[in-house]
Curated annotation (Swiss-Prot):
Domain of life: Bacteria
One GO cellular component term: urease complex
The protein's name in its UniProt record: Urease subunit beta
HAMAP family linked: Urease_beta (MF_01954)
UniProt cross-references to InterPro entries, sorted A to Z: Urease_beta-like (IPR002019), Urease_betasu_sf (IPR036461), Urease_subunit (IPR050069)
Molecular function via GO: urease activity
Any single Pfam family the record assigns to this protein: Urease_beta
The protein's Enzyme Commission number: 3.5.1.5
Length: 104
């Protein structure tokens, strides 16, 4: 074995398997491009993006880590979102949640 060497099994790796998803239509009503990263809490994206924010609460883009989606001015497109996992706590971003997503 070489230090740092990985032994990978044959087959496909399915991202976000068995996680809740939602598909939303998103429009950029602004005058500048808006780019959203893979792990940004979609509910808290730029207000110029128009979509059903309630359905996006606790969700992020269902894309590979480290990638992003760009919305040009006037552009509309459908995106697939996936539920955040782990503790389901959100801090930062635009400060609209600042705590647990699932209130007990």
């Amino acid at each position: 074995m070489i230090p740092g060497e990985l032994f990978i099994q044959d087959g496909e790796i399915e991202l976000n398997a068995e996680r809740e998803t939602a598909t939303l239509s998103v429009a950029n009503a602004g005058d500048r491009p808006i780019q959203v990263g893979s792990h940004y809490h979609f509910f808290e994206t730029n207000p110029a993006l128009q979509f059903d924010r309630a359905k996006a609460r606790g969700m992020r883009l269902d894309i590979a880590a480290g990638t992003a989606v760009r919305f040009e001015p006037g552009q509309s497109r459908e995106v697939q979102l996936v539920a955040l996992a782990g503790k389901r706590e959100v801090y930062g971003f635009r400060g609209e949640v600042m705590g647990k997503l699932d209130k007990a």
